[in-house]
Amino acid sequence: MSNNMAKIAEARKTVEQLKLEVNIDRMKVSQAAAELLAFCETHAKDDPLVTPVPAAENPFRDKRLFCTLL
């Protein structure tokens, strides 16, 4: 009997999850990929990995300090 009750509880949990998922807006993968590609192309100019930061503005550039040891 306990096994039967566990199956019923699991089925109820599954039904509740499906009720939540039925209201989710979905889109085709091709549409999502096209939107993502358009977003990336639009924002590419602001991405430092695509268009590098000029050396004069780069806070992580080498400082090139020269030390002489006597």
Swiss-Prot record:
Gene Ontology molecular-function annotations: G-protein beta-subunit binding
GO cellular component: heterotrimeric G-protein complex
Cysteine methyl ester sites (modified residues): C67
Organism for this UniProt entry: Rattus norvegicus
Subunit structure of this chain's protein: G proteins are composed of 3 units, alpha, beta and gamma.
Family: Belongs to the G protein gamma family.
Role summary: Guanine nucleotide-binding proteins (G proteins) are involved as a modulator or transducer in various transmembrane signaling systems. The beta and gamma chains are required for the GTPase activity, for replacement of GDP by GTP, and for G protein-effector interaction. This subunit may have a very specific role in the development and turnover of olfactory and vomeronasal neurons.
Covalent lipid adducts (S-geranylgeranyl cysteine), residues: C67
Short name of one Pfam family: G-gamma
Keyword Hydrolase (UniProt): no
Protein name: Guanine nucleotide-binding protein G(I)/G(S)/G(O) subunit gamma-8
Propeptide stretch(es), residue numbers: 68-70
Disulphide bridges, residue numbers: none
Membrane topology designation: Lipid-anchor
Gene that specifies this protein: Gng8
Compartments where located: Cell membrane
Keyword entries, A-Z: Cell membrane, Lipoprotein, Membrane, Methylation, Prenylation, Transducer
InterPro entries membership: G-protein_gamma-like_dom, GGL_sf, Gprotein-gamma
Entry superkingdom: Eukaryota
Any single GO BP term: cellular response to pheromone
CDD domains per the UniProt record, alphabetical: GGL
Tissues and organs where the protein is expressed, per its UniProt entry: Detected in the olfactory epithelium, the vomeronasal epithelium and, to a lesser extent, the olfactory bulb.
